Amino acid sequence: MAKAPMRVAVTGAAGQIGYSLLFRIANGDMLGKDQPVILQLLDLPQAQQAVKGVVMELEDCAFPLLAGVVITDDPKVAFKDADVALLVGARPRSKGMERKDLLEANAQIFTVQGKALDEVASRNVKVLVVGNPANTNAYIAMKSAPNLPRENFTAMLRLDHNRALSQIAAKTGKPVSSIEKLFVWGNHSPTMYADYRYATVDGKSVKDLINDPVWNNDVFLPTVGKRGAAIIEARGLSSAASAANAAIDHVRDWVLGTNGKVVTMGIPSNGEYGIPADTMFGYPVTTANGKYEIVKGLEIDAYSQEKINITLNELEEEKAGVQHLLG
């Protein structure tokens, strides 16, 4: 028997990431090749015409799994009964804009969206915040939706995770698929800490294979942390297809499970590994039956603790910067 369609809300639907994302969702890449979807697309009033153009293209692909499309500039229409919500749209940083102003501009957007999700989304909605600053935007949305479970709100660290994977694959000369137990701690920003101390490639320790602390500090972490800036420098535009791909990976694994494989998700802390409760923090997780679980019992050495503290301090500062807007 055919499955009932799942409702997938996407904000910033007319944007670059949205354009890279929607066709893959409609093709079944995110929720499975047997799962029909209804896309509920949100964007600003001035972007409605552009969204209509994207929808024409979606129609022209004749995707068997696409059961319907809604276009709107009203969050309450976009999030109505949503099973999955991808919050992609965010205020980008414009020239001369202070980080504080960026935080405040986004706080307003994500407060409105959090409240709308709280009112109209499915009680089991899975929310992924892609729009930057992703961790803090996810924190704001979560705090604005007191009637939804906190664990329904997540931030995207999967792009950092995938970037780290590809760097390790290149360094070891091994395929990406052979690398396991690599993960990322903290904020989706250059302070994130990609940790390969427990990673294996074909069952062998990556740390032993590479055995190069200088490469770790001077090449690996800066390359992963500043990859977004390097792409803007090279392409003149921010990373869109890779961000969309990471969003699909994140939701697919959350919904369909990782079969014991460790991945990275930005999730609200319950105090694990000494991170203050409610902090939206990148953690190593496994997922099954639509739920994620933090990998327990990892030893945090002095070097790792120092790196985790740096990214945590940045997140605490961001959190403090928006607290007055949360009432």
Swiss-Prot record:
Gene Ontology molecular functions: L-malate dehydrogenase (NAD+) activity
Active site: H188 (proton acceptor)
Keywords: NAD, Oxidoreductase, Tricarboxylic acid cycle
Catalysed reaction, written as an equation: (S)-malate + NAD(+) = oxaloacetate + NADH + H(+)
The keyword NAD appears for this protein: yes
Annotated residues for binding of substrate: R93, R99, N132, R163
Catalytic EC class: oxidoreductase
GO biological process, one term: tricarboxylic acid cycle
Positions of NAD(+) binding: G12, A13, A14, G15, Q16, I17, G18, N106, Q113, V130, G131, N132
EC nos: 1.1.1.37
The organism's place on the tree of life at top rank: Bacteria
Function summary: Catalyzes the reversible oxidation of malate to oxaloacetate.
Family the entry assigns: Belongs to the LDH/MDH superfamily. MDH type 2 family.
Name listed for the protein in its UniProt record: Malate dehydrogenase
